[in-house]
Structures are given as C-alpha cells and as structure tokens.
C-alpha cells in the first residue's frame, strides 16, 4: 500500500478497539438473526494489523481462538511478533504481506477485521479487501470494515485540503514536520475566522472541528489528514461494492445509524416514506440527517441474507440471551421515568463492570422490590419494560451486549495468583518491548490507560498466592509515587497503593485460583 513509508516515519500507536472485538461482532450477528461462530474458538483475520495491538489482547483472553494479522510494514510486523513471543502467546502471528497477494489459499476465517484502512488505500486495494471478505470468510462468518463517510466528511475535507496546501511547497520534510506546519496553518485560519462575527457565527461548527484536530495527537492527525489518500464515500456506494462480490450489508456497529426506532415519530415516519422498507436507503437518509462522518460496517455472505431480521423488532429469546454491561452513570439512571426499571438499574449500577442478563434484572425485582400489585401480570409488564429499556440502551450505546464472557475470579487473600501469561503481557507492554507502541486491552478489547510499572510489580509479587501482609511487605521495597494535578509526584505507601492495584488486576480478570 502506498502509505507504507509514512507509517514507518510517524509512529501510529497500535491500540485495541472494543468495537472490533469478535465477541461483539458475534453478538451483533445473533441480534440480526445469524448464527456466527463462537468467538472464543474462532479463526480471526485482521488486515492492516500494524504491531498487532488490536488482536494481541484478544488472543490473550481467547486461547482457543486463532488470530492472524496482515500488514505491509515489515518493521511493525517484526516488532509485533517479538512482543507476541515475549508474552508467550501461541495462538497469534503477524505476517508481512501485501493485501493484493491474499487469495483463497490463505484460508477461511470466521471473523475478518479491517479497521482504519479502507479509506486510506487505492481503489484496487479497496476492491481486494471486499473480495477477501467474500473469498476468505466462512459461510456464517462476519466481516467488519470501518471507513470515512460522506456527507459528514465534506467539511473535514476542507481542513485536510488546507493542511495539504500548507505543505505543498515542502514535499521533502518529515511527516512530523508536515503535521506541525499543517496545524499551525489551520490554527491561524481559525483565529482569523473568529475575528469576524458573521463568519464566526456561520462557520462555528467548522471552527470547532479545526480546534478538535489541533488537540489530537500528531500520529493520528498525520495519518487522518496528510496521507496521499483519504477517500470517504457514501454508504450506498459502499454497499454497491459489497453487492458486486455477493456480500450482504448487515448493520453499523453504531446501532443509531441503522435502527430508526429511537428517533422521534416524525423522523421514523419520513424515513419510512423515503426508504419504502429498504434498510440501506433508510440508513443513507439517516446519514444525511445526522451528517455522519464515520461508519463501522458489519458484513456477511450473500447466502445469509434471508436469515437477516431488519424489522427493528428483535425476538425476546435473543435479547434475554445476551450478557449486558452498563455505560450509564448513576445520575442518568436517576432520570428514568419507569420506577421499577429505575430501581433495578440503580442496584445494577453499583457493580458496573459485572455483566447481567434481563432475567437477572427481573429476578432482582421479584426478590427485592416491594410493590402492592406484584402478580404475574405485573411481572410481565416489568419484563416488557426491561426489554424495551435494554434494547433502546443497546441502540444508544449505553449498554453493551455479548454472547459470552471470560470468568472473572475475585481477589481472595492467599487464595489467588496472577498466571504467567498475564504477568508477561503487562510487563511487556508497560516496561518491555511493547511499551509506547501497543496499548493494553481488557477482555472486551477496551483500552486500559491506568496501568503502570508498580502494577507490574504487584502482579509479579502475586505469582503465587500470598497474604496481604506478605504482599505489602514485598511491595514496600518499591518507591511508589502518585502524580498530582499540578504534575508533582507525591510518594505514597505500599499499604495505600496495594488495594488500588488489586482492583485493576481484578477488573482485568487476571486472577486465577490454585
């Protein structure tokens, strides 16, 4: 791919992205009526995998699954494989390969992930990516492709064009210098626009977009704004490409871009009139209304099309089967109108990282919420309200849903330990070969930013079960500093820090029982 050299020149940190996790893609497939492979035992291919940061964490938590990453950049593939070897993972490898050279002999995969690649490659590579999603996807497999989208990118195109113009006469400077020059240029433009009231009022959103880019990290701006290719397209154009390869568009990962039922009645009615039941037309119209800038498409084989449920009404047994996790704050739950649902959710939010099912929520109501009219009719009413609330929350990305999850062993003094593979993982990514280039992810592929070298020490101390007294005594040999708001480091005791570290390790699911 043509942008190979710039990826070497301006390092793009390889992070996990939760919305690409096979466990999530599996759940979306089941929501829409498909029967994808159990993600814990699947074969997964990522195109444009860089150092492997998006799939290394998944390989860590899913030892029975197999992960293959493909990238053209030799240095990143080599470094990523060194990190994988250091961690000790046996179910993942990165391959230096041109996407154009992949054919059916490369094998079949249950999930194919293409994140942050599609809009930045020539048309011939785009077409090949789509072809791979046909030829190398299992019959019931699911592919994920993200891409920049019109109409939302129309304004962003102007900013990109300004930054490219700022570097027009300096083709030989480094990518990092181009980013700084481009940022300086658009900063001046925004400042001057603000001087003139009529312009500032008319182009307020545009100015905010510029300010947003000025606050972004250089590696992201360099690849988003200054690559030779950044080629947004409309949803309908993307779907046309899929159809040429007999692929079927399912939905966007952002369900608000696919399911209209959460909008007001007028919007729903007009979308129905415009689309006449065609889900792609409906979503394209939503993009015009919402000025959509980015999409994360889910795709399956054309042979699966007749299984898909586009009715926006999903069977109760499917909703009830999902493991759910909260993204609500307590303040948001307090605003709920339905009192029984509010009471249930206020209880569940006390353990926000613990998953639950709709039936778990109903059971809590049956056993703990006192109402005078508690009978079967009332139970059915509460259950219906719960399902409605959960579905709306799923669409609005306030509840995440999965088909399965990793066992989370709680911390017990002198009863649990941290297995070697997890200790190797955080050590390698925090103080070892992967430090600064690969982000840490949890079992849901969410990026974790609060781990540090002291947590590595705590994990190593707990390589065997220990009493807290023993563990803290060992930890007290380490100088521990907490960075305050003013940037100053304040020393704290092992007694203070140990419980904090335990919470982190527990949340990550690192504990096991002997």
Which residue stretches match the model-derived regions?
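Conserved SAM/SAH-binding beta-strand->alpha-helix loop
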Residues: 73
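A short acidic, Gly/Pro-enriched loop at the edge of an enzyme's catalytic core
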Residues: 103-112
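Conserved alpha-helix/loop element of class I SAM-dependent methyltransferases that forms part
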Residues: 13-42
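Conserved SAM-binding strand-loop segment of SAM-dependent methyltransferases
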Residues: 88-99
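Conserved SAM-binding loop of SAM-dependent methyltransferases across substrates and taxa
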Residues: 51-64
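Conserved class I S-adenosyl-L-methionine
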Residues: 145-171, 186-188, 192-198
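Long, charge-rich, low-complexity alpha-helical segments
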Residues: 260-276, 280-295, 299-300, 332-514
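A short glycine-rich, Lys/Arg-flanked "PGG" loop and its adjoining helix->strand segment in the class I
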Residues: 127-139
């Amino acid at each position: 791919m043509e942008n190979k050299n710039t990826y070497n020149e301006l390092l793009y940190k390889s992070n996990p992205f939760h919305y690409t996790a096979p466990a999530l893609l599996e759940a979306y497939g089941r929501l829409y009526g498909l029967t994808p492979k159990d993600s814990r035992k699947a074969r997964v291919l990522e195109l444009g995998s860089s150092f492997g940061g998006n799939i290394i964490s998944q390989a860590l938590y899913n030892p029975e699954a197999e992960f293959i990453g493909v990238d053209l950049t030799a240095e990143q593939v080599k470094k990523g494989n060194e990190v994988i070897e250091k961690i000790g993972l046996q179910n993942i490898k990165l391959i230096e390969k041109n996407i154009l050279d992949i054919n059916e002999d490369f094998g079949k995969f249950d999930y194919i992930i293409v994140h942050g690649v599609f809009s930045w490659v020539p048309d011939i590579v785009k077409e090949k990516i789509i072809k791979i999603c046909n030829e190398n996807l299992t019959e019931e497999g699911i592919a994920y492709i993200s891409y920049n989208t019109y109409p939302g990118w129309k304004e962003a195109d102007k900013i990109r064009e300004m930054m490219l113009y700022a570097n027009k006469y300096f083709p030989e400077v480094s990518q990092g210098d181009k980013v700084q020059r481009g940022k300086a240029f658009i900063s001046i433009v925004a400042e001057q626009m603000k001087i003139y009231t009529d312009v500032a009022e008319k182009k307020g959103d545009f100015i905010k977009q510029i300010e947003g880019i000025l606050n972004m990290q250089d590696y992201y701006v360099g690849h988003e704004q200054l690559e030779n290719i950044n080629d947004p397209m409309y949803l309908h154009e993307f779907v046309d490409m899929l159809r040429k390869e007999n692929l079927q568009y399912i939905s966007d990962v952002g369900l608000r871009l696919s399911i209209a039922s959460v909008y007001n009645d007028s919007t729903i009615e007009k979308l129905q009139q415009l689309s006449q039941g065609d889900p792609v037309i409906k979503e394209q119209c939503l993009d015009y209304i919402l000025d959509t800038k980015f999409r994360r498409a889910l795709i399956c084989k054309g042979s699966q099309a007749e299984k898909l449920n586009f009715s926006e009404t999903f069977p109760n047994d499917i909703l009830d089967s999902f493991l759910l996790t909260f993204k609500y704050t307590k303040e948001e739950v307090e605003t709920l109108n339905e009192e029984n649902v509010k009471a249930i959710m206020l209880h569940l939010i006390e353990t926000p990282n613990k998953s639950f099912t709709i039936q778990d929520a109903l059971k809590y109501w049956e056993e703990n919420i006192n109402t005078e009219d508690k009978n079967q009719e009332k139970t059915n009413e509460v259950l219906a309200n719960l399902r409605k609330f959960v579905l709306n929350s799923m669409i609005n990305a306030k509840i995440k849903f999965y088909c399965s999850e990793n066992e989370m062993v709680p911390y017990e003094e002198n009863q649990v330990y941290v297995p070697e593979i997890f200790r190797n993982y955080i050590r390698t990514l925090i103080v070892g070969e992967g430090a600064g280039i690969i982000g840490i992810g949890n079992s849901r592929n969410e990026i974790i930013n609060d781990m540090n070298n002291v947590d590595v020490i705590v994990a190593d101390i707990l390589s065997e079960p220990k009493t807290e007294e023993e563990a803290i005594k060992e930890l007290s040999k380490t100088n521990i500093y907490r960075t305050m708001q003013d940037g100053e480091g304040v020393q704290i005791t092992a007694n203070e820090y140990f419980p904090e570290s335990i919470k982190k390790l527990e949340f990550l699911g690192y504990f096991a029982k002997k």
